[in-house]
């Protein structure tokens, strides 16, 4: 005898009084559950980077939304392609002439530098070199009180693993070395102390 049970579209009532869900229904439920798990996995992966933090240093979450910041400039260094981005406070300061006018960047100014391994598009006209797999993302933030012992800036470097799609703090073996603080870029950037420790110029556009 065929009856309708709540939660199952069509079932067969067996002599033992059990409701056996049709095979097609089981398959549909299985597919839906698999899709839900995959969706949850993607969501978790997308959120993971915002939980990453350098011990006694910068947290990835301090730069939430950096992917949509305006471009300051692009560069190639050490065989990697990079794009340098700035938050509104950083861009406004550049537009006002900082640091060329001798004034420092304001507290709250932030920069992000995304590095990719280069990839040559051999089938495209001119065989252009374009970004391939991501390598890392580096951050700078101006906070003259918080980072008084490093020129008013805090630095953080986070390496990317394309296999697991996750970020982790760079290590002492990285370039620049990332210790348990926010000074990984300070030694290098002292070369441009007269530019408020910022190498990148705002490209004309």
Please provide the spans of the model-predicted regions.
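Sequence context surrounding c-type heme c attachment/ligation sites in exported
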Residues: 46-78, 102-205
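Short, Lys/Arg-enriched N-terminal segments with co-localized hydrophobic residues
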Residues: 1-20
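Bacterial N-terminal signal peptides
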Residues: 29-40
């Amino acid at each position: 005898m065929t009856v309708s049970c709540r939660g199952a579209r069509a079932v067969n009532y067996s002599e033992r009084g059990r409701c056996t869900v049709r095979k097609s229904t089981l398959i549909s439920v299985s597919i839906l559950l698999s899709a839900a798990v995959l969706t949850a996995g993607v969501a978790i992966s997308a959120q993971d980077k915002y939980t990453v933090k350098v011990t006694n240093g910068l947290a990835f979450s301090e730069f939430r939304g950096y992917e949509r910041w305006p471009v300051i400039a692009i560069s190639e260094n050490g065989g990697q392609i990079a794009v340098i981005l700035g938050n509104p406070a950083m861009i406004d300061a550049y537009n006002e002439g900082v640091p060329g006018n001798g004034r420092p960047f304001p507290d709250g100014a932030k920069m992000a530098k995304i590095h990719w391994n280069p990839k040559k598009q051999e089938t495209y006209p001119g065989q252009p070199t374009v970004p391939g797999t991501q390598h890392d993302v580096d951050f700078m933030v101006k906070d003259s009180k918080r980072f008084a012992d490093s020129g008013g800036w805090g630095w953080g470097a986070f390496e990317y693993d394309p296999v697991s799609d996750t970020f982790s703090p760079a290590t002492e073996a990285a370039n620049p070395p990332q210790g348990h603080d926010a000074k990984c870029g300070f030694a290098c950037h002292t070369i441009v102390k007269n530019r408020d420790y910022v190498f990148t110029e705002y490209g004309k556009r």
